[in-house]
Amino acid sequence: MLEAKIDPLVLARDIVRAYLDTMEARDLARARRFLAPGFAMIFPGGRRFTELEEMAEWAKPRYRWVKKRYERFDVAQGTTATHVYCFGTLYGEWNDGTAFESIRFIDRFTVRAGKLVDQMVWNDMGELAAKLN
């Protein structure tokens, strides 16, 4: 009988995608299960969050909702962890009801022992919001 081997790079990518799906649905309790102790999210401008609820509260005055269209996931094995890069665009609705779309983003995740250690976020949302105000 052949034993199936799970590719660790594919597994890391799938963990990130499942986490992103739960975050998009704002199922924070389920999303928390993907996180390693000490997990941190770092957003543009150096804004750092260690609690998902804190990030969700921070986002409330920025937009009503946001979703991601994924272009690709790139995965690289490091010496102590796997790094998953997620590329795409954001779309959603500002708090005034105006729709937005095509906002570029890149997220970089560090995955170790099947858990997310950190997430670094880069996007053009702040630049677009500044133009609208």
Model region roles, listed by residue range:
Residues 104-132:
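Short beta-strand edge/turn micro-motifs at domain boundaries
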Residues 35, 90-92, 123:
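Short beta-strand segments enriched in hydrophobic/aromatic residues
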Residues 28-82:
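A solvent-exposed, acidic/Ser-Thr-rich amphipathic alpha-helical stretch
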Residues 80-90:
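A short hydrophobic beta-strand element
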Residues 19, 30-32, 39, 51, ...:
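Hydrophobic pocket/interface hotspot
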Residues 6-10, 50, 100:
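Residues at secondary-structure transition points
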Residues 1-37, 132-133:
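Short, low-complexity N-terminal intrinsically disordered segments enriched in polar/charged residues
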Residues 89-113:
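Exposed beta-sheet edge and beta->alpha loop/turn motif
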